[in-house]
């Protein structure tokens, strides 16, 4: 029974950490000119130093307290496909 309680505490701590990070991201987006975060979205691109290949994070705040991010990395493309692989993370801050 102690292991179950410990697991619960670990999961709770991880959720609280993600909620804190999502809240900080929401505040940063609002300070960066997102006057209406319900309909705004942006893409942040970082270039890898050696490969000069962009890794983009698409950020969307569809409603107050919710942040959607998608990590796009062009190196995951196959030769025959033209779309990037995306990993979606949805965070609820409320």
From Swiss-Prot:
GO biological process: wound healing
Source species of the chain: Homo sapiens
Keyword check for Magnesium: no
Residue ranges that the Swiss-Prot or TrEMBL entry lists as coiled coil: none
Stated name of the protein: Surfactant-associated protein 3
Tissues expressing the protein: Found in lung alveolar cells type I and II, as well as alveolar macrophages (at protein level). Detected also in testis and kidney. Expressed by different tissues of the ocular system like cornea, conjuctiva, lacrimal gland, eyelid and efferent tear ducts (at protein level). From these tissues is secreted into the tear film (at protein level).
Major location category of this protein: cytoplasm
One CC-aspect GO term: extracellular space
Keywords: Cytoplasm, Secreted
Transmembrane segment boundaries: none
Keyword Secreted annotated: yes
Function according to Swiss-Prot or TrEMBL: Putative surfactant protein. May be involved in wound healing and in the reduction of the surface tension at the ocular surface.
Entry's induction text: By lipopolysaccharides (LPS). Down-regulated by cytokines IL1B; TNF and IL23. Up-regulated in tears from patients suffering from different forms of dry eye disease (DED).
Subcellular location field: Cytoplasm; Secreted
């Amino acid at each position: 029974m102690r292991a179950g309680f410990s697991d619960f505490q670990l999961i709770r701590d991880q959720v609280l950490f993600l909620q804190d990070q999502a809240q900080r991201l929401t505040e940063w987006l609002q300070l960066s000119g997102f006057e209406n975060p319900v309909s705004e979205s942006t893409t942040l691109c970082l270039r890898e130093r050696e490969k000069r290949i962009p890794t983009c994070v698409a950020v969307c705040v569809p409603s107050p307290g919710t942040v959607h991010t998608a990590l796009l990395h062009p190196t995951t493309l196959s030769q025959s496909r033209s779309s990037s692989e995306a990993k979606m993370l949805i965070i609820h801050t409320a």
